[in-house]
């Protein structure tokens, strides 16, 4: 797409997916850069992910870890939304250097995401697609949780919790979805937190046992991933992580939750604090590299990222 969309001039395409495309745009009035997400085709009858995302962002304004909804509207019958232009995703960082994270920096990311998830849940919503692609870093050195196209309320109009039902189609991203989601059980708060747990394991160990880079998402791949998750013990999954006893308790709390039960976010946060303050590092850089090191991200991006994570002490919000 070239040219203009309403009050915005299109600069370049920066992303795409089943929903449509994302463009870097400039607002005509002030020439500031933003990210504009728009459908590529008018949706057929049923769920419209961008309209759903607009609704979610509208409900979630007020959390510093959720991007501000700048604008939204319709252009030639296609729905669009406008958000601040963020720099890069956690996925970008991991692809450039899989062993980038120390235990402490990974734990800080986990604490910030836990805080964002608690806020989302407090507004009666689920994210339903926690993964590295949806964790972004902004120009103000903040971590943001983005992409609410798959988000859904877990509370009904009368304030009651949605019922637990089976036979649901699988939704989310294969590597990070919960075991219950694999089993076709309706998602609730516990499922977002299980996805966060898997993301933490990825940051601590640089991989997940069921990940097969480049593998196509198929019924066979889905079944194989489900089987590994069901049969692999949390003790084996956390093996090699110093402070693993706290991470094991993190998972055990999540897996013990009933469908409609409220998680104990404060307890989960305290477990991450204990991991953070355990003495040894598992992997990753222990210090910033020397200036003469000219690797792709080992200098400038490292120092940028350290500024994001400083100070290390992340307080519990709420």
Swiss-Prot record:
The listed locations are:
Nucleus
Any GO BP: DNA repair
**EC numbers on record:** 2.7.11.1
Looking up Pfam families in the UniProt record yields: Pkinase (PF00069)
List, alphabetically, the InterPro entries matched: CK1_Ser-Thr_kinase, Kinase-like_dom_sf, Prot_kinase_dom, Protein_kinase_ATP_BS
Give GO terms: molecular function aspect only: ATP binding; protein serine kinase activity; protein serine/threonine kinase activity
Active-site annotation: 129 (proton acceptor)
**GO cellular component assignments:** nucleus
Does the UniProt entry include the keyword DNA repair?
Answer: yes
What is catalysed by this protein? L-seryl-[protein] + ATP = O-phospho-L-seryl-[protein] + ADP + H(+); L-threonyl-[protein] + ATP = O-phospho-L-threonyl-[protein] + ADP + H(+)
- Which intervals hold domain Protein kinase? 8-276
Give UniProt keywords alphabetically: ATP-binding, DNA damage, DNA repair, Kinase, Nucleotide-binding, Nucleus, Serine/threonine-protein kinase, Transferase
Q: Which amino acids does the record list as binding ATP? A: 14-22, 37
PROSITE patterns, sorted? PROTEIN_KINASE_ATP (PS00107), PROTEIN_KINASE_DOM (PS50011)
Tell me which domain of life the UniProt entry assigns to the organism this sequence originates from.
Answer: Eukaryota
Q: Which Gene3D superfamilies match?
A: Transferase(Phosphotransferase) domain 1
Top-level EC class: transferase
Please give the function described in this protein's UniProt entry: Involved in DNA repair. May regulate the activity of protein(s) involved in double strand break repair caused by gamma rays.
The entry sums up its family as follows: Belongs to the protein kinase superfamily. CK1 Ser/Thr protein kinase family. Casein kinase I subfamily.
Q: What is this protein called?
A: Probable casein kinase I homolog ECU11_1980
């Amino acid at each position: 797409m070239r040219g203009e969309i309403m009050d915005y001039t299109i600069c370049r395409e920066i992303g795409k997916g089943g929903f449509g495309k994302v463009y870097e745009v400039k607002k005509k009035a002030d020439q500031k850069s933003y990210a504009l997400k728009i459908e590529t085709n008018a949706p057929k009858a049923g769920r419209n992910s961008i309209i759903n995302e607009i609704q979610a962002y509208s409900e979630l304004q007020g959390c510093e870890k959720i991007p501000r909804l700048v604008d939204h509207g319709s252009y030639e019958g296609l729905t669009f939304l406008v958000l601040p232009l963020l720099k890069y995703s956690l996925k970008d960082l991991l692809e450039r250097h899989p062993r980038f994270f120390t235990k402490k920096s990974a734990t800080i990311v986990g604490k910030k995401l836990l805080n964002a998830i608690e806020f989302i849940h407090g507004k009666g919503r689920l994210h339903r697609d926690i993964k590295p692609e949806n964790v972004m870093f902004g120009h103000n050195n903040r971590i943001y949780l983005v992409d609410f196209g798959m988000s859904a309320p877990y509370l009904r109009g009368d304030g009651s919790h949605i019922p637990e039902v089976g036979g649901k189609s699988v939704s989310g991203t294969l590597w990070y979805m919960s075991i219950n989601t694999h089993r076709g059980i309706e998602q609730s708060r516990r499922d977002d937190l299980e996805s966060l747990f898997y993301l933490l394991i990825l940051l601590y160990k640089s991989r997940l046992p069921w990940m097969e880079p480049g593998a196509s998402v198929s019924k066979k791949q889905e079944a194989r991933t489900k089987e590994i998750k069901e049969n692999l013990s949390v003790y084996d999954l956390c093996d090699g992580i110093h402070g693993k006893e706290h991470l094991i308790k993190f998972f055990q709390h999540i897996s013990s939750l009933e469908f409609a039960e409220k998680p104990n976010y404060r307890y989960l946060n305290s477990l991450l604090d204990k991991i953070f303050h355990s003495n040894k590092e598992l992997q990753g850089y222990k210090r910033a590299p020397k200036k003469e090191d000219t690797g792709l991200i080992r200098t400038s991006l490292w120092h940028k990222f350290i500024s994001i994570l400083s100070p290390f002490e992340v307080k519990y919000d709420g």
